[in-house]
Amino acid sequence: MRTYEVMYIIRPNIEEDAKKAVVERFNGILASHGSEVLEAKDWGKRRLAYEINDFSEGYYNIVRIQTADNEATDEFQRLAKISDDVIRYIVIREDEDKTRK
């Protein structure tokens, strides 16, 4: 099983209820496609290093998952790419040495 860290930034002008729905939707996508959510963190609203789509802030969410295949991460990336609410995302595979400790 491989461990991944998924980080995504939600646009800052979203309503609180809509933000919660987006977080539940994307975390649910990861969980429903055969991965186990190890940890989910909401970092809140933070300033971006540079503007993205005319936004200088965004809501950061970080999720650590464990999965046997890439189905969950592929589906997450596909849906995040077409979502207007997610302004940036990245999926990183953690080193196996780090996860074994």
UniProtKB/Swiss-Prot annotation:
This is Small ribosomal subunit protein bS6. Binds together with bS18 to 16S ribosomal RNA. InterPro entries: Ribosomal_bS6, Ribosomal_bS6_CS, Ribosomal_bS6_sf, Ribosomal_S6_plastid/chlpt, Transl_elong_EF1B/ribsomal_bS6. The keyword Calcium does not apply. The keyword Manganese does not apply. One of its GO terms (molecular function) is small ribosomal subunit rRNA binding. One of its GO terms (cellular component) is ribosome. PROSITE patterns: RIBOSOMAL_S6. Pfam families: Ribosomal_S6. Coiled coil: none annotated. GO terms for biological process: translation. Belongs to the bacterial ribosomal protein bS6 family. Keywords: Ribonucleoprotein, Ribosomal protein, RNA-binding, rRNA-binding. It comes from Staphylococcus saprophyticus subsp. saprophyticus (strain ATCC 15305 / DSM 20229 / NCIMB 8711 / NCTC 7292 / S-41).
